[in-house]
């Protein structure tokens, strides 16, 4: 299927099952965080998945290629970005497997219904301080800062739409780890797995991947860390099989 690209759009190869994605040329592109989250999330055959704050739709696209999940829903509040993600789904002939929904994360349980999903994935805005933003409605500001939703909104709605025993997978920043774990426990999501991500072996972690289970028992495994680069510009072996992000913008 041919898709006409709009102004400031480009087509990128995801290097997986021939999939392609439409992205903005002016910087709104998927980042390493989305790639790592799609690799960390475990989706079993027949499971239904919801991606909260899907942006370009990168996470459901990657998960549809690497897992045997039955269906992937994806929620995005920005209409233009949601429509762009929908065009990527059509481009890849995945309309029967991936559904892009334009809507607010804070309304996710109303939109989809309680206990509707086996898995929730989310790459939410990392920054909770919007000080200095020139225009809080800009695409990048919304994806990076808690302008339209908070960490608590994401966790609360994720917990509501998960079935008992369902799993949430989140990528976030280590400086908010205590807040993340506390909020998850507040909404009966028990953290079960955690993996820190370091840009280089000798650098501090700059991302954290977390799996939490709705109603799970109090026991968590801290897994071996991910090291992204072996040297500047050269990915470690772990990442050679993953799509390469064009920049570090969250999606």
Question: Which sequence ranges carry the predicted segments?
Answer:
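Class I SAM-dependent transferase core
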Residues: 2-44
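Conserved Class I SAM-dependent methyltransferase catalytic core
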Residues: 148-198, 205
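Conserved SAM/SAH cofactor-binding pocket of Class I
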Residues: 42-122, 127-133
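Residue-level signal for inorganic ion chemistry
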Residues: 37, 123, 154, 212
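Conserved small/polar residues in nucleotide/adenosyl-binding loops
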Residues: 240-245
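Mobile active-site "lid"/loop adjacent to the S-adenosyl-L-methionine
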Residues: 124-153
């Amino acid at each position: 299927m041919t898709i006409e690209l709009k102004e400031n759009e480009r087509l990128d190869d995801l290097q997986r099952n021939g999939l392609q994605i439409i992205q903005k040329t002016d910087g709104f592109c998927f980042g390493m965080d989305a790639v790592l989250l799609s690799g960390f999330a475990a989706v079993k055959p027949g499971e239904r998945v919801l991606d909260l704050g899907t942006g370009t739709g990168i996470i459901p696209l990657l998960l549809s290629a690497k897992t045997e999940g039955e269906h992937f829903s994806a929620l995005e509040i920005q209409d233009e970005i949601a429509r762009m993600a929908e065009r990527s789904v059509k481009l890849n002939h995945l309309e029967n497997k991936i559904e892009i929904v334009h809507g607010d994360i804070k309304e996710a349980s109303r939109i989809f219904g309680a206990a509707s999903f086996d898995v929730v994935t989310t790459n939410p805005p990392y920054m909770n301080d919007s000080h200095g933003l020139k225009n809080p409605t800009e695409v990048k500001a919304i994806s990076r800062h808690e302008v339209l939703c908070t960490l608590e909104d994401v966790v609360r709605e994720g917990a509501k739409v998960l079935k008992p025993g369902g799993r949430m997978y989140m990528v976030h920043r280590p400086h908010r780890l205590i807040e993340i774990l506390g909020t998850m426990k507040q909404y009966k999501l028990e953290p079960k797995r955690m993996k820190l991500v370091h840009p280089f072996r000798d650098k501090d972690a700059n991302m954290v991947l977390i799996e939490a289970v709705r109603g799970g028992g109090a026991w968590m495994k801290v897994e071996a860390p991910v090291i992204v680069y072996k040297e500047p510009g050269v990915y470690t072996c772990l990442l050679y099989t993953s799509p390469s992000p064009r920049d570090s913008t969250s999606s």
